[in-house]
């Protein structure tokens, strides 16, 4: 369910209408980015399609999110294909957060990042949660990051929930 609505019978149109509430960031960020487009264009595309912000408001929000994710402004006009893996992952986060969703699905977003980059991404997520009251569904094998970012942790095995824990 999403906001109390049963989603089991939803078609593509139902999901499309609710994309502003729910966004996802995947382990392979390059799959959600257009490698030929600039960083700015990749983010603005989502904002144009899913928000009613003016061009000025979009530019301001992109600047704020670039700063929040510690991405240099000079990267705005660089094609996404020229970014490192960590930068692509952060750009994917910027893109998802740019429309201010209520829910973020984070699929192995820390996987493959060095410790410094992973910590930076976790700090971004913690700050974003505090500022915008966004809930996360964090899919990870890293129990330390799960504990750091989660209130409730479900442990799954073979597709089944085997344990539920609430952080105290």
What are the functions of these language-model segments?
Residues 100:
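Conserved catalytic motifs of ABC-family nucleotide-binding domains
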Residues 57-74:
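Conserved ABC ATPase "signature" region
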Residues 140-141:
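H-loop/switch region of ABC-family ATPase nucleotide-binding domains
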Residues 6-23, 41, 49:
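ABC ATPase NBD coupling module
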Residues 146-148:
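A short, surface-exposed alpha-helical micro-motif characterized by mixed small hydrophobic
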Residues 79-83, 87:
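Conserved ABC ATPase signature
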């Amino acid at each position: 369910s999403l906001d109390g609505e049963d989603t089991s019978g939803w078609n593509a149109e139902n999901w499309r209408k609710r994309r502003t509430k729910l966004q996802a960031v995947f382990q392979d960020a390059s799959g959600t980015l257009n490698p030929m487009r600039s960083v700015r264009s990749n983010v603005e595309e989502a904002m144009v399609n899913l928000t009613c912000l003016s061009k000025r408001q979009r530019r301001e929000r992109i600047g704020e999110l670039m700063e929040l994710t510690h991405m240099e402004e000079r990267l705005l006009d660089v094609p996404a294909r020229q970014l490192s893996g960590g930068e692509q992952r952060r750009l994917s986060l910027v893109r998802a957060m740019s429309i201010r969703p209520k829910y973020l699905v984070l699929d192995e977003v820390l996987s493959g990042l060095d410790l410094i980059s992973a910590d930076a991404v976790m700090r971004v997520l913690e700050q974003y949660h505090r500022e915008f009251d966004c809930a996360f569904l964090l899919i990870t094998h890293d129990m330390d990051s799960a504990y750091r970012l989660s209130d409730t942790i479900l442990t799954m095995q073979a597709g089944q929930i085997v344990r539920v824990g609430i952080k105290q």
